[in-house]
Structures are given as structure tokens and as C-alpha cells.
């Protein structure tokens, strides 16, 4: 099997396993897996050491960029568990992990659609974040000569925008970067030239 095909297979395996690990339903069924167990399993799977070992021993791949990519987005139910788990554990100190998850499932089902909406909003924002990070990673993996001046500008400007507007959604952050890029081309030609020359290297 060619090295490129092996890497694609590894990426697909990572995607499948992470999707399976995080497959906690938002519907009426009580999730069966414990959130802390899911988090620990995911952490172990995503670790660079584990990824490198699996890449070498299973696929015979050596080199860089073997990690499974950006942190996956959470479901609405995951955000709910993250928000409520500590309180449930405090109120039920003798309960085992699977019992805590059962209680969380019951609490989730008791919520009205309006009460659940905040968690669905968090999940939607987190999905935007994941897709944005995934696109950034995809572009970073290309050769430097293929990176556009606009992308290089966004890499520098995005952290600044997020710091200035911590509650801004990923979509709006991207829009703000685009706005600043257009303003820079008009108001700061020296800076614009810097990114054009950087992209040309």
C-alpha cells in the first residue's frame, strides 16, 4: 500500500473512531457511556504518542502530522452533561458513574425544548469552530507556496479578533477577518505588501 493511501486510511480510521467515541445521542435515549470515560478514551486516542505508535505499528507510517486533527465538536447533550455533572455528583456522592449518567439522562429528558435550546446553540457554535479549525488545518498541510496572502493574514489576525471579541462566533470571526483584510488593502498598503510577498516565498 502506498504511503499516501496509508495516511488516508489512518485519517479515515481516526475520523470513524472519534465519531464512535463521541456518538452520544441528543434524543430521548439515555446515553450508555460515562462522559468522563468518553473524555479519557478520546484523550488517549488523540495523544501524539498513541497516534505515532499506531501509525508505525499498524500502518507502517513514519513522519509528522499523524495526529487526528482539531478537537471534535460536542453535542448538545455533551454540553448539558458538562454543565450539570458536577452538581449531580455532589447531590449523589454514592452513585457510580453509570448511575450518574442515568440521572443526567433523566434530567435531560425533563428539559423543555426552550431549556435545551441553549445547549443546541452551544453545539452549533462548537460545530462551526470545528469546521473552521478543520479547514485551517487542511490549508496548513498544503505547501507554503500554495498559501494565499489572505490566509496568512487570517492566521495572524484571527487570534487578535478572538481576544477582542471572546463571545463572537467562528463565522463572525471569519467575517471580521475578511473585513479587516479589505480595510488593510486600502489603508495599509505596506502591511498588505508584506503578506503578498510572504505568500510568494
UniProtKB/Swiss-Prot annotation:
Its main location: host cell. Keywords: DNA-binding, Host nucleus, Repeat. SUPFAM superfamilies: HMG-box. The keyword tRNA processing does not apply. PROSITE patterns: HMG_BOX_2. GO terms for cellular component: host cell nucleus. One of its GO terms (molecular function) is DNA binding. InterPro entries: HMG_box_dom (IPR009071), HMG_box_dom_sf (IPR036910), HMGB (IPR050342). SMART domains: HMG. Residues 70-138, 143-201 bind DNA. It is found in: Host nucleus. Gene3D superfamilies: High mobility group box domain. Belongs to the IIV-6 401R family. This is High mobility group protein homolog 068R. It comes from Invertebrate iridescent virus 3.
Amino acid at each position: 500500500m502506498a504511503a499516501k493511501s496509508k495516511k488516508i486510511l489512518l485519517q479515515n480510521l481516526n475520523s470513524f473512531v472519534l465519531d464512535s467515541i463521541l456518538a452520544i445521542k441528543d434524543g430521548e435515549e439515555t446515553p450508555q457511556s460515562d462522559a468522563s470515560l468518553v473524555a479519557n478514551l478520546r484523550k488517549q486516542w488523540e495523544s501524539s504518542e498513541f497516534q505515532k505508535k499506531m501509525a508505525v505499528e499498524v500502518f507502517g507510517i513514519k513522519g509528522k502530522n499523524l495526529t487526528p486533527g482539531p478537537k471534535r465538536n460536542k453535542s448538545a447533550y455533551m454540553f448539558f452533561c458538562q454543565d450539570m455533572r458536577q452538581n449531580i455528583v455532589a447531590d449523589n456522592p454514592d452513585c457510580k458513574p453509570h448511575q450518574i449518567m442515568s440521572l443526567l439522562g433523566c434530567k435531560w429528558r425533563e428539559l423543555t425544548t426552550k431549556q435545551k435550546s441553549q445547549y443546541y446553540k452551544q453545539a452549533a457554535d462548537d460545530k462551526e469552530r470545528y469546521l473552521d479549525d478543520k479547514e485551517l488545518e487542511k490549508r496548513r498541510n498544503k505547501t507554503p507556496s500554495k498559501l494565499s496572502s489572505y490566509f496568512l493574514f487570517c492566521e495572524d489576525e484571527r487570534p487578535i479578533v478572538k481576544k477582542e471579541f471572546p463571545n463572537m462566533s467562528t463565522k463572525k470571526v471569519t467575517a471580521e477577518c475578511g473585513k479587516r483584510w479589505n480595510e488593510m488593502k486600502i489603508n495599509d498598503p505596506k502591511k498588505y505588501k508584506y503578506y503578498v510577498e510572504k505568500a510568494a516565498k
